[in-house]
Every structure is written in C-alpha cells, then in structure tokens.
Amino acid sequence: MLNLNLRTAFLITKAVIPSMVEHKQGKIVHIASRTGLKGEATVGPYSISKAGVIRLTETIAEEVRDYGINCNCVMPSVIDTEANRKAMSDADFSKWVRPEEIARVILFLCSDDAKIINGAAIPVYGQS
C-alpha cells in the first residue's frame, strides 16, 4: 500500500514540480482518504499510506507556495463504484460519494477560485 499510494503520489509530484516552478504556477491535488485521519482496524496499511499522502500534501504545499503552486488533497469516504457495491453488497449505497462528486471538488481546487487554498485536506464524505 505504501508503494502504491504514497510512493506513487510522491514520484508524480516530484516529476511535475520543476515545470510548475519554471512557469510560476500549478495545482497539485492528491487523493487521500478519510482513513488517513483516523486508522481503521481492517485496513491498517491503507490507512497508513493515506495518512502519508496527507502529510506529503502539507509538506509539498509549504515547499512550493512561493512559486505560485498550490498542493491540496481530497479525502473521500467510501466511493460508489461497481467494485465497492460488489464487495459491500449489504451497504446503503445512497449515502456513498459518487466519483463525479469527487471530480467536482478536484476541479474547484484546480480553479482560480481556490488560489487561496493550499495544504488543505478536504473531506468528501457524502452522507456516509
């Protein structure tokens, strides 16, 4: 999980920052999880990796703020996907956040309207 979630976020961020610094602007949005704030017993490695993504976001935000770059993350709860519906068939899907709802939050964070938001971990929990 650390390799997949945290290392991947780190390497992609490391790859895009030089161009953003050169252009004196940029938006980085990582995908974390609500479990990154409070671990859950059944998904320990996942929680740890997502906590790392949140700390990575905060650290990068501080490091690049003077270059006109914002770095934030979104923390979805359970996402309404086909795979999750199969895995949790007894759950109330009506309360889950949909992928397009997460996308709208990400689009906002990438907009000029969000230029004052930097280093934030935005919860996207729906009604769960």
Question: Which role fits each region the language model picked out?
Answer:
Residues 33:
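Residue(s) in the substrate-gating loop at a strand-loop-helix junction
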Residues 66, 73, 81, 91-127:
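C-terminal helical subdomain
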